[in-house]
Amino acid sequence: MSTRIITEPTVEPLVLADVKVHLREDLTSASNDALITTLIQVARQEAEHRLQRALMLQTLEQTLDAFPVATDTNPLAAIVLEMPPVVDVTSVTYTDAAGSTIVLSNTLYTLDAAREPAQLVPSYAAGSWPATQGSVAAVRVRYRAGYSTSAAAATAQAAVPSAIRQWMLLAVGDMYERRAAS
């Protein structure tokens, strides 16, 4: 099982002007804006890696070699979505036994996004997951994750917990101070 980013976030949890104030940088000078913007992105990526959480809205794809089967420890044959908080599932595709790529109807699975990490289970109507071809990455689940579904930057940024944003400010400050001399 692996997860990769399909669509990167379009907004970062920190505002450039706020970071410049934190760094005691001149707000009217743009000389270091590109560097600081890059450091903000790096801090978000590091926070996401450490926390195993998507901070800003992004599209992810999780691959599995087959659908899970019901067991004593996984009675619902749940697929655990690795990067919370999950907003929604955009598609589930799989390679069937004949080698054809099939898009699974959203009526055949149920997302339990209230649980963390979120789980995807076969719907009651489906009963179980379909059979797949015995191949690597035969199942692909695309989903959106992040603290906010808002396209408005201020709303999305405010949805990220303040402790995470504060850690990011400190991380950006540390990287900024330790950068190589130009």
Locations of the language-model features?
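Divalent metal-cofactor coordination and adjacent catalytic microenvironments
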Residues: 1-182
